[in-house]
């Protein structure tokens, strides 16, 4: 009888353990199911587009990889903290077109992560350095980038596909209205020749029928040589309206030298590459492009 009691007690313990194990497995599965879909963006323009597409979608987290003041990713070197951020990402949204020239390192380390190329299928502008990557500064191409990001997110995260599609459509509607407003303002400006700070604005210029006749810095962040400076001075002097455009992310020293030599007036065009990665950034692209529109309207009269 004692043996039978011991056997029954042992069976009861084993059964309880098994049931607890099943409960633990179920809880583990539920926790796994609740794991957020983590999206990392390479830099600010991609962050702004992506938070519009994911706005209000439960279970989705968006993080911008680079710091608020990084700007364009020309010659950007990945840091240890960047790789740690990407380590937990399900998808990495990049501009593409050669902007992120560190991608070999990323794909080598994160083989399971979905790479979302915002510039897929967009016709690129070529210059002496190769493909120009500043695609987002054409509103038409920015719309194409939003569509690309949304379509690829829908593939990577089908559980939220309907929400991504709805948000993308709403944002594209706003961008289309922006495009109409900017064309109405800029298509008729009397002067079309401009001098920009670096090679950020060819897509913008193509969209709004402007001619970039010179750039102040041939290499971003590198002061022009004396001969390059003199060449730009001569080009500005040949303009009927002497204006040149700086960017808030770079030192205006070279532009100020040109202005002193030519009497040109300096204006600022913002390529929308810096800002805080917060939900408030949702309107950053549209707001900044409207400011650029007003600057050009004044400068090119």
Predicted regions and their residues:
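Sec-dependent N-terminal signal peptides of Gram-positive bacterial secreted proteins and lipoproteins
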Residues: 3-26
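Extracytoplasmic metal-acquisition and chelation regions
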Residues: 21-301
């Amino acid at each position: 009888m004692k043996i039978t009691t011991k056997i029954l007690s042992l069976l009861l313990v084993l059964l309880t353990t098994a049931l607890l194990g099943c409960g633990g497995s179920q809880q583990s599965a539920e926790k796994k199911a609740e794991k957020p879909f983590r999206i990392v963006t390479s830099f600010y323009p991609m962050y702004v587009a992506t938070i519009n597409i994911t706005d209000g979608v439960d279970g989705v987290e968006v993080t911008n990889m680079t710091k608020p003041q990084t700007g364009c990713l020309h010659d950007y070197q990945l840091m240890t903290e960047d790789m740690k951020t990407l380590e937990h990402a399900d998808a990495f949204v990049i501009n593409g077109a050669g902007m992120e020239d560190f991608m070999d390192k990323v794909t080598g380390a994160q083989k399971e992560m979905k790479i979302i190329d915002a510039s897929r299928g967009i016709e690129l502008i070529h210059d002496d350095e190769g493909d120009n990557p500043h695609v987002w500064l054409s509103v038409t191409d920015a719309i194409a980038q939003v569509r690309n990001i949304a379509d690829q997110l829908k593939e990577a995260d089908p559980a939220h596909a309907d929400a991504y599609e709805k948000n993308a459509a709403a944002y594209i509607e706003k961008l289309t209205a922006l495009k109409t407003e900017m064309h109405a303002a800029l298509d008729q400006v009397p002067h079309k020749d401009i001098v920009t700070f670096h090679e950020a604005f060819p897509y913008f210029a193509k969209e709004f029928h402007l001619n970039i006749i010179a750039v102040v810095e041939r290499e971003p962040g590198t002061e022009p040589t004396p001969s390059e400076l003199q060449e730009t001075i001569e080009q500005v002097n040949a303009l009927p309206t002497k204006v040149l455009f700086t960017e808030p992310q770079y030192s205006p020293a070279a532009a100020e030298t040109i202005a002193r030599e030519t009497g040109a007036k300096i204006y600022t065009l913002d390529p929308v590459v810096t800002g805080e990665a917060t939900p408030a950034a949702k309107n950053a692209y549209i707001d900044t492009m409207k400011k650029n529109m007003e600057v050009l309207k004044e400068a090119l009269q």
